[in-house]
């Protein structure tokens, strides 16, 4: 038990009761004069003037004066007009704080019979005493601390009557007193009650007062014939358990002593006389204890506690570990002159009693049995936290695997989404992978040149998928591969989140996606180098058909997904020109570079655009790049004001859809052209006639060509330009011809008009039978190309054939060829976007 030691003294207050009607009738002079709140004068001198007509009775009417004009100083003096609340505020209200801190407290009222002790302690209806007020205040403070601490309140109520102890709450026979080394003075058999509220406690106090012994005497009509002791025990502890938990136990004693009386004044006889004698004996023992404690002044001396049962019960309250308040009740009348004087004398003597206060705090260190329970709780908490941490780490690993970044792949334009090439069933993925392996062998022998045509076709394929009533989003391209001017962007995986069970399927889709990208790049490289054979074209078309079927199924599930809109099937790439609104964007220098370098080799008819004129957007500044050191022949493009372009013959191309082309290192024609990258052969492999449509260049510096005369006949036919002396077609004049730069002077270079005009490459006429276009692709022999090219080629037998036949979709007839006898089937070598 840990105790905080504190020195204190007994606090003494004096209360002067009002005069009774009997005292007023006797016209006795008062012997008490209250000077201030702390001082009073006993038996003051009579004033010479006095009151006119008022004469005090002589000495024969009262006792002689003793200690005339005596002054007493106390901690507090209450006059005749003081209320019960005033007495409570300066007595028990102040010591309640110490009581809740674990200090024992005691309040007792001392005085002669009829001085107002019981009225001060118990009060009456409508004017409760200190016991009632203290109980209410105690419960109010306990409720204020209820959230922090747990409280347990016990009460007991006993009386000492004729030197016998009786229980007032449960009346029974006399009880004995025992000394306990730890608890001090105890009364075995005394009942303790635990009230649930302050009202219940007051009800118990009222019931005990009714059991108390009272008899009227001549001095007091309601004289108490016993000493009453009301005790309150409070045990409190913190609500949060722990090793530092402390248990506080305190006791408060509210004592109403019986008044000393004189037999001559009370005229007591028989039982009342014996009661009075026992009361006086116990009070005498109390006075002796007070004198012994006052004379000791901290020294060890004998204190006669055993002279009376009252002093034994009050051992802790008066001279022990307790904060004590003594209320001295006196009468102002001279009828009680001797009793008042004795009360003031003993009260003044009690002020000299010094006390040693100790706070009763029981440390939790002594409760070893709680350690095992606390250890079990801590172990359970550690196990729970470890399990929670493992679950968190497992979830983090799964999320990291799910959101792992894709490996570096080939650069593709932003307009192409990776989700458009994702295969569906596993059988199709295996077929695509087999085709891509053979194409990889061809790519290694060709290098990494001529990527411009690939991007042009991809842009055209993207424009097909956009619905006519909506505008396809245009994104700014960014260069990705060094040495390649083609704008590209890294492919992004699907935005959908997959569960861990679908990781295997996602891995297969990603693998198939990489294979399709490789095949796409292979096709563009072969096409740009003019190394495609009919067998290769057939295999690539078969591969494109598989992707088309998967895109159609995937589009049916989520038609509004932006990623599906980028999957461009082959059939839509050759849609009718009548369904397109034409290319309305400006022809940039980058577009002219691509077409200037590619159309000399292959004239690739690009797919028409499916967007309307209302959805065109202005080109971004990123489209106009600066000249690189690899293009010394390029001249700076003139600054042209932004304006709305006329309908171009390339409806599949929107603004920003044509990426930059790979520059060539060797001239493909005798005319002045841009340099291209090295190629195994300087000659172009002649093939069947391929007609192409390219946009109008902004100036001759960009197209490196001179204007030609417009043809006056329909051009939607098949021409053979491999003859020795091809005829030079005539051209009609354009409406916007004055907008073309005057630098277009030479007539021996290809020209990019703004109206539908076809540009053809020169070559010798192939000796092939006049059959349909699809039959020509299948029956063409590699020897025809080998006779006119020095580039090493792989024989068509080394390429793996598709598992199923593929039919090249035929484009619809153009309105310009309705009066022509020939059909578009005569066109061969048409390139489709992949």
Curated annotation (Swiss-Prot):
InterPro entries: Kinesin-like_fam, Kinesin_motor_CS, Kinesin_motor_dom, Kinesin_motor_dom_sf, P-loop_NTPase
Known role: In complex with KIF2C, constitutes the major microtubule plus-end depolymerizing activity in mitotic cells. Its major role may be to transport KIF2C and/or MAPRE1 along microtubules.
Start-end of Polar residues biased regions: 462-474
A Pfam match: Kinesin
Keyword flag 4Fe-4S: no
Gene Ontology MF terms: ATP binding; kinesin binding; microtubule binding; microtubule motor activity
Domain of life (superkingdom): Eukaryota
Ranges annotated as biased composition (Low complexity): 411-432
Alphabetical UniProt keywords: ATP-binding, Cell cycle, Cell division, Coiled coil, Cytoplasm, Cytoskeleton, Microtubule, Mitosis, Motor protein, Nucleotide-binding, Nucleus, Phosphoprotein
Oligomer and partners: Interacts with MAPRE1; this interaction is required for efficient accumulation at microtubule plus ends. Interacts with KIF2C at microtubule tips; this interaction increases the affinity of both partners for microtubule plus ends and is required for robust microtubule depolymerization. KIF2C phosphorylation by AURKA or AURKB strongly reduces KIF18B-binding.
Name of the protein this chain belongs to: Kinesin-like protein KIF18B
Key word Protein biosynthesis present: no
Coiled coil region boundaries: 368-404
Domain Kinesin motor: 9-353
Similarity comment: family membership: Belongs to the TRAFAC class myosin-kinesin ATPase superfamily. Kinesin family.
Biased composition range(s): Basic and acidic residues: 611-620
Biological processes, Gene Ontology terms: cell division; microtubule depolymerization; microtubule-based movement; mitotic cell cycle; regulation of cell division
Record localization: Nucleus; Cytoplasm; Cytoplasm, Cytoskeleton
Residue numbers binding ATP: 111-118
Cellular component GO terms, alphabetical: astral microtubule; cytoplasm; cytosol; microtubule plus-end; nuclear body; nucleolus; nucleus
């Amino acid at each position: 038990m840990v105790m905080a030691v504190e020195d204190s003294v007994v606090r003494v207050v004096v209360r002067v009761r009002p005069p009774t009607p009997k005292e007023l009738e006797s016209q006795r002079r008062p012997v008490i004069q209250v000077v201030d709140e702390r001082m009073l004068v006993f038996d003051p001198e009579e004033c010479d003037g006095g009151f006119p007509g008022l004469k005090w009775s002589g000495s024969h009417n009262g006792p002689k004066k003793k200690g005339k004009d005596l002054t007493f100083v106390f901690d507090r003096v209450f006059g005749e007009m003081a209320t019960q609340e005033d007495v409570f505020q300066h007595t028990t209200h102040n010591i309640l704080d110490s009581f809740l801190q674990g200090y024992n407290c005691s309040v007792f009222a001392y005085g002669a019979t009829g001085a107002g002790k019981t009225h001060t302690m118990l009060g009456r209806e409508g004017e409760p005493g200190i016991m009632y007020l203290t109980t209410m205040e105690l419960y109010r403070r306990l409720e204020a601390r209820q959230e922090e601490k747990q409280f347990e309140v016990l009460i007991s109520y006993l009386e000492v009557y004729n030197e016998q102890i009786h229980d007032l709450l449960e009346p029974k026979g006399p009880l004995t007193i025992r000394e306990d080394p730890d608890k001090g003075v105890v009364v075995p058999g005394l009942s303790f009650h635990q009230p649930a509220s302050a009202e219940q406690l007051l009800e118990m106090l009222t019931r005990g007062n009714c059991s108390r012994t009272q008899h009227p005497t001549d001095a007091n009509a309601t004289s108490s014939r016993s000493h009453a002791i009301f005790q309150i025990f409070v045990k409190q502890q913190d609500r949060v358990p722990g090793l530092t938990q402390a248990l506080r136990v305190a006791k408060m004693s509210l004592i109403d002593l019986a008044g000393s009386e004189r037999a001559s004044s009370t005229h007591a006889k028989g039982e009342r006389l014996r009661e009075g004698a026992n009361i006086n004996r116990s009070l005498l023992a109390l006075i002796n204890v007070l004198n012994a404690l006052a004379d000791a002044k901290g020294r060890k001396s004998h204190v006669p506690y055993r002279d009376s049962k009252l002093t034994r019960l009050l051992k802790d309250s008066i001279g022990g570990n307790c904060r004590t308040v003594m209320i001295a009740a006196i009468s102002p009348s001279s009828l009680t002159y001797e009793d008042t004087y004795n009360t003031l004398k003993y009260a003044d003597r009690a002020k000299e009693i010094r006390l040693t206060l100790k706070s009763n705090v029981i440390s939790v260190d002594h409760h070893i049995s709680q350690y095992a329970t606390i250890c079990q709780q801590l172990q359970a908490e550690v196990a729970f936290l470890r399990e929670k941490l493992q679950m968190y780490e497992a979830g983090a690993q799964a999320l990291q695997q799910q959101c792992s970044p894709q490996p570096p792949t080939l650069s593709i334009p932003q307009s192409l989404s990776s989700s458009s090439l994702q295969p569906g069933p596993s059988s199709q993925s295996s077929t695509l992978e087999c085709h891509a392996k053979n194409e990889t062998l061809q790519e290694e022998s060709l290098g990494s040149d001529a990527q411009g045509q690939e991007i042009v076709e991809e842009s055209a394929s993207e424009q097909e998928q956009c619905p006519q009533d909506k505008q396809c989003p245009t994104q700014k391209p960014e260069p990705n591969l060094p040495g390649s001017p083609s704008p590209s962007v890294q492919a992004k995986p699907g935005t959908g989140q997959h569960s861990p069970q679908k990781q295997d399927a996602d891995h297969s889709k990603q693998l198939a996606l990489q294979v399709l990208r490789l095949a796409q790049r292979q096709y563009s490289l072969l096409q740009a180098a003019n190394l495609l054979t009919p067998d290769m074209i057939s295999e690539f078309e078969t591969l494109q058909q598989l992707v088309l079927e998967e895109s159609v199924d995937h589009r049916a599930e989520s038609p509004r997904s932006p990623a599906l809109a980028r999957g461009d099937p082959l059939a839509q790439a050759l849609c009718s020109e009548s369904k397109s609104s034409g290319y309305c964007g400006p022809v940039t220098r980058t577009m002219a570079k691509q077409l200037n370098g590619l159309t000399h080799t292959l004239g690739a008819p690009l797919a028409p655009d499916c967007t309307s004129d209302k959805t065109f957007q202005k080109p971004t500044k990123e489209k106009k790049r600066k000249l690189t050191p690899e293009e010394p022949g390029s001249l700076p493009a003139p600054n042209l004001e932004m304006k709305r372009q006329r309908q171009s013959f390339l409806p599949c191309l929107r603004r920003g859809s044509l990426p930059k082309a790979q520059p060539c290192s060797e001239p493909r024609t005798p005319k002045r052209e841009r340099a291209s990258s090295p190629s195994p052969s300087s000659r172009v492999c002649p093939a069947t006639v391929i007609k192409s449509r390219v946009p109008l260049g902004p100036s001759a510096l960009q197209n490196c060509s001179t204007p030609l005369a417009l043809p006056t006949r329909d051009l939607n036919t098949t021409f053979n330009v491999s003859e020795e002396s091809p005829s030079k077609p005539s051209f009609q004049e354009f409406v916007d011809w004055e907008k073309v730069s005057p630098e277009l002077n030479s007539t021996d270079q290809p020209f990019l008009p703004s109206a539908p005009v076809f540009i053809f490459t020169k070559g010798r006429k192939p000796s092939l039978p006049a059959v349909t276009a699809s039959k020509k692709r299948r029956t063409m022999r590699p020897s025809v190309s080998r006779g006119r090219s020095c580039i090493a080629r792989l024989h068509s037998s080394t390429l793996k054939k598709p598992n199923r036949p593929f039919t090249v979709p035929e484009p619809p007839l153009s309105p310009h060829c309705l009066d022509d006898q020939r059909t578009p089937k005569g066109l061969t070598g048409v390139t489709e976007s992949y």
